[in-house]
Amino acid sequence: MALFSKKDKYIRINPNRSVREKPQAKPEVPDELFSQCPGCKHTIYQKDLGSERICPHCSYTFRISAQERLALTIDMGTFKELFTGIESKDPLHFPGYQKKLASMREKTGLHEAVVTGTALIKGQTVALGIMDSNFIMASMGTVVGEKITRLFEYATVEKLPVVLFTASGGARMQEGIMSLMQMAKISAAVKRHSNAGLFYLTILTDPTTGGVTASFAMEGDIILAEPQSLVGFAGRRVIENTVRESLPEDFQKAEFLLEHGFVDAIVKRRDLPDTIASLVRLHGGSPR
């Protein structure tokens, strides 16, 4: 009779007992660290885009904020903002509109979809307007219309050229007919500025569409555009469904507009300050 029993050389696992594994934390990559280029679809490290926000692979021109535009365009420290504090009265009492405005102000740091003021660009004093598509797609409401109108009126009195960077998804639907009347209102101010013999330069940026395109964006004495910018009135699908025809692949791109005479020149972002200053000087310069 054996005094000692032979031990098994393996361990027994109860199949009915659940084995819980500790969840492993997944590495998190901040959303703002990388961007996908809409042009070539490359994933790009944000720092590789540089301050100009240009794709290093295909030279696609990314959209930028009004603050970024100021930093790239004007002489440092020369911007003096005008017409701040104007607020929409929400004429239609559109549901959720005031909440939307408050959210956009907090998110963008802007009060409205356009920044207006005066600045020096390579030593030339200009009345400057910059529309920012980050604010409700830079849609044109009563405040946008009022600020741009006042900019032209101020420039007319002070005998300044106007430089306007346009970007917009069109009229602001939350303000109805009040937003549409801004087209005529701004155009009248543009005409008075022109009658005074003053220079108006527009730079079309991505996207410039709707009522903005149908009015002051295309009324400049000279019209420039950034590369590959979308510029048009109605959307591509709306037009195709209306005319029952397929449109060219590059339809409504800045290059297409240049080819058909709607734009005077396409200028790379890095070249815009020098180009703007040269055109202002060519048209008499600024009085200051």
UniProtKB/Swiss-Prot annotation:
GO cellular component, one term: acetyl-CoA carboxylase complex
Cofactor comment text: Binds 1 zinc ion per subunit.
One MF annotation (Gene Ontology) recorded for this entry: zinc ion binding
Top EC class, one word: transferase
One of the protein's GO biological processes: fatty acid biosynthetic process
C4-type ZnF: 37-58
InterPro entries, sorted: AcCoA_carboxyl_beta, Acetyl_CoA_COase_Trfase_b_su, ClpP/crotonase-like_dom_sf, COA_CT_N
List of residues binding Zn(2+): C37, C40, C55, C58
Any matching Pfam family: Carboxyl_trans
EC number: 2.1.3.15
Cofactor(s) listed: Zn(2+)
Catalysed transformations (reactions): N(6)-carboxybiotinyl-L-lysyl-[protein] + acetyl-CoA = N(6)-biotinyl-L-lysyl-[protein] + malonyl-CoA
Gene3D superfamilies per record: 2-enoyl-CoA Hydratase, Chain A, domain 1
Pathway: Lipid metabolism; malonyl-CoA biosynthesis; malonyl-CoA from acetyl-CoA: step 1/1
Keywords attached to this entry: ATP-binding, Cytoplasm, Fatty acid biosynthesis, Fatty acid metabolism, Lipid biosynthesis, Lipid metabolism, Metal-binding, Nucleotide-binding, Transferase, Zinc, Zinc-finger
Subcellular location, record wording: Cytoplasm
CoA carboxyltransferase N-terminal domain: residues covered: 33-288
Family as reported in the entry's similarity comment: Belongs to the AccD/PCCB family.
Family annotation (PANTHER family): ACETYL-COENZYME A CARBOXYLASE CARBOXYL TRANSFERASE SUBUNIT BETA, CHLOROPLASTIC
Subunit-level organization: Acetyl-CoA carboxylase is a heterohexamer composed of biotin carboxyl carrier protein (AccB), biotin carboxylase (AccC) and two subunits each of ACCase subunit alpha (AccA) and ACCase subunit beta (AccD).
Its biological purpose: Component of the acetyl coenzyme A carboxylase (ACC) complex. Biotin carboxylase (BC) catalyzes the carboxylation of biotin on its carrier protein (BCCP) and then the CO(2) group is transferred by the transcarboxylase to acetyl-CoA to form malonyl-CoA.
Protein name, per record: Acetyl-coenzyme A carboxylase carboxyl transferase subunit beta
Source species: Streptococcus pneumoniae serotype 4 (strain ATCC BAA-334 / TIGR4)
Gene: accD
